[in-house]
């Protein structure tokens, strides 16, 4: 089109010049040559302008194509995007949580720390102690999560890194850091003995006594056994089980990982899981070397009772295997007067009922309990450790906007020590959660 226009312009100029030559007085030969030169110059300028216009359009199209290639592409799982120049999909998510807490009896910490852990006694003060109510606020449960997915010839390579701020001095703390390829997972994540599908949804960070909520470095193999049934086998870090001695506590000398196995059934009406642990406790001091096998069994379920109501529960029993695993287990083993190890028997669990009142309002009630079976000599040596623990959590959750939850919870805990003393404590907590 532009070439035809240029030709028409050129022909018009040429016709005008010829008309001048016919109807004007005869011109000198030099003047005609000047006109020809001017016409040639005009034609060259037109060609240069056209070439410049073509180059500008080509440059613009190239820039648009480059920008398109650099644009962020949607990833292969919800909320993810493709890393430029890669087939790896990544995402960044988490939530911000503010907790406002009032302890009626004494400061129990940023979570409702009423349970024994690793040979340390409960934070609940015994009857007759000083009452010191406290109000506090913190945001330590705030969570950051990074996920990735990369297709490979061997299957999908998935990774997750997740942190919160429960490290010392509000520092970042690693919660999860693992990779999985096909049926194999390696890294730190929830212990194979527990199941997230049967965990209490409390405003408090920990939940009731008797629950299992631990993460362990591990290597895990999972295999589907049918449409809804999965089998898992894992080797996990034993996390230095606690041994009670006549003078205090010591950590087990770790020589081998714990062996765990689980069966998980997940259906439309709920979930059931059965899991077990086999490990070892070892004591070494001078010429004394003792080792002992420890075990634990976990049963968990959540069952729908109609459309909006759900029943939750777990039961745990162990011979030393629940130490640093179940909230409330005091230790793994006791070293007796003959320098022989004896496993500490513990059992516990929780039961809960939740109900959805509407699309934005729900409530829950949970009761947890733990029993530690100490021998008389261990009771005498460790009178402040808890023989029994109980706790209740009653809460209401409200979602006023998408990705926002407001929770209000009352909790109360009781304990009885090996020495026969008792104590209890109560707390109110408000939690504001903003997910992203």
Which role does the model predict for each range below?
Residues 27-109:
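N-terminal periplasmic/intermembrane-space "pro-region" immediately following the signal or transit peptide
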Residues 78-241, 253-271, 302-306, 310-317:
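Outer membrane beta-barrel
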Residues 106-110, 166-174, 197-203, 238, ...:
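Outer-membrane beta-barrel translocator domains and adjoining extracellular loop/strand segments
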Residues 265-386:
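Detector for outer-membrane/organellar transmembrane beta-barrel domains
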Residues 398-400, 424-436:
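Outer-membrane beta-barrel "beta-signal"
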């Amino acid at each position: 089109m532009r070439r035809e226009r240029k030709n028409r312009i050129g022909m018009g100029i040429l016709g005008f010049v010829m008309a001048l030559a016919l109807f004007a007085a005869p011109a000198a030969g030099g003047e005609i040559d000047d006109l020809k030169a001017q016409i040639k110059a005009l034609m060259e300028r037109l060609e240069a302008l056209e070439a410049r216009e073509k180059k500008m359009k080509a440059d613009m199209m190239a820039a648009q194509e480059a920008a398109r290639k650099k644009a962020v592409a949607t990833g292969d799982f919800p909320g993810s995007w493709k890393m430029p120049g890669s087939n790896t999909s990544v995402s960044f998510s988490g939530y911000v949580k503010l907790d406002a807490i009032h302890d009626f009896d004494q400061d129990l910490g940023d979570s409702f720390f009423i349970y024994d852990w690793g040979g340390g006694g409960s934070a609940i003060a015994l009857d007759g102690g000083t009452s010191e109510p406290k109000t506090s606020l913190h945001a330590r449960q705030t969570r950051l999560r990074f996920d990735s997915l990369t297709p490979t010839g061997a299957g999908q390579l998935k990774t997750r890194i997740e942190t919160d701020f429960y490290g010392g001095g509000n520092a970042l703390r690693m919660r999860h850091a693992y990779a999985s390829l096909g049926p194999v997972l390696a890294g730190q994540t929830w212990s194979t003995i527990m199941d997230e599908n049967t965990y209490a949804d409390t405003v408090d960070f920990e939940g009731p006594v008797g629950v299992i909520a631990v993460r362990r470095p591990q290597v895990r193999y999972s295999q589907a056994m049918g449409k809804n049934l999965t089998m898992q086998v894992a080797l996990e870090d034993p996390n230095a089980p606690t041994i009670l001695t006549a003078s205090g506590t010591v950590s087990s000398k770790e020589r081998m990982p714990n062996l765990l196995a689980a069966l998980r059934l997940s259906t439309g009406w709920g979930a059931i899981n059965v899991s077990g642990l086999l490990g070892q406790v070892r004591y070494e001091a001078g010429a004394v070397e003792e080792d002992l096998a420890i075990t634990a069994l976990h049963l968990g379920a959540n069952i729908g009772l109609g459309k909006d109501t759900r029943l939750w529960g777990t039961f745990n029993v162990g011979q030393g295997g629940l130490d640093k695993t179940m909230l409330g287990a005091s230790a793994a083993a006791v070293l007796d007067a003959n320098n022989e190890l004896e496993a500490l028997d513990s059992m516990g669990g929780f039961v809960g009922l939740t109900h959805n009142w509407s699309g934005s309002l729900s409530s829950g009630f949970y009761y947890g309990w733990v029993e530690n079976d100490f021998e008389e000599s261990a009771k005498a040596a460790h009178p402040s450790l808890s023989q029994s623990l109980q706790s209740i959590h009653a809460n209401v959750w409200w979602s006023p906007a998408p990705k926002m939850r407001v929770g209000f919870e009352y909790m109360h805990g009781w304990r009885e020590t090996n020495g026969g003393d008792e104590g209890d404590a109560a707390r109110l907590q408000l939690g504001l959660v903003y997910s992203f």
